[in-house]
């Protein structure tokens, strides 16, 4: 396996599950958003404010291309990474892709206090999350080797489920 790549909406558990998977597999963990912040010295909301979403997405595309060009990492992507076709191609080619699915209700609960999510600076975050999931869900599924539900499941249980199901996948 080249890399293990986690996609899904914000609040699905990509970073939490990714860190646990990396530890279990003895691989480095990378979060594309955190890598962008490290490189730029700025947080994601600041980048959105100064460069707009297109500017952030350009940075994200470059980071995903770089990280998918490596071998042997567990990679958590930002929720909107799948919006660009170039990213979907890179992610699919970069390794096994696991779509961590979470209901809008779970996403709302998990992101309610997080001020680091520019797209949720709206009057109705639940509606925003619903709208985003409606657009992005087919794109996550398009590139996923596995779809794993995270609602009401402890992270450790999700990790064990992923590891077991990865072993059952045919080579590609």
Curated annotation (Swiss-Prot):
Substrate binds at residues 33, 57, 79, 136. Its cofactor is Mg(2+). One of its GO terms (cellular component) is cytosol. Its EC number is 2.7.1.71. Pathway: Metabolic intermediate biosynthesis; chorismate biosynthesis; chorismate from D-erythrose 4-phosphate and phosphoenolpyruvate: step 5/7. Monomer. Belongs to the shikimate kinase family. This is Shikimate kinase. It comes from Pseudomonas fluorescens (strain ATCC BAA-477 / NRRL B-23932 / Pf-5).
């Amino acid at each position: 396996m080249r890399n293990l790549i986690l996609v899904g909406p914000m609040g699905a558990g990509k970073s939490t599950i990714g860190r646990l998977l990396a530890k279990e597999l003895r691989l480095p963990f990378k979060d594309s958003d955190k890598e962008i912040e490290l490189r730029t010295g700025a947080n994601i909301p600041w980048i959105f404010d100064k460069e707009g979403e297109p500017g952030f997405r350009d940075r994200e595309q470059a980071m995903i291309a770089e990280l998918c060009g490596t071998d042997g990492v567990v990679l958590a992507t930002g929720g909107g990474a799948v919006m660009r076709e170039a990213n979907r191609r890179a992610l699919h080619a970069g390794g096994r892709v696991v779509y961590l699915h979470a209901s809008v209700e779970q996403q709302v609960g998990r992101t309610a206090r997080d001020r680091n999510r520019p797209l949720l600076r709206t009057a109705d975050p639940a509606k925003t999350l619903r709208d985003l999931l409606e657009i992005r869900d087919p794109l996550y599924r398009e590139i996923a080797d596995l779809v794993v539900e995270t609602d009401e499941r402890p992270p450790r249980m999700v990790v064990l489920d992923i590891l077991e199901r990865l072993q059952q996948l045919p080579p590609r």
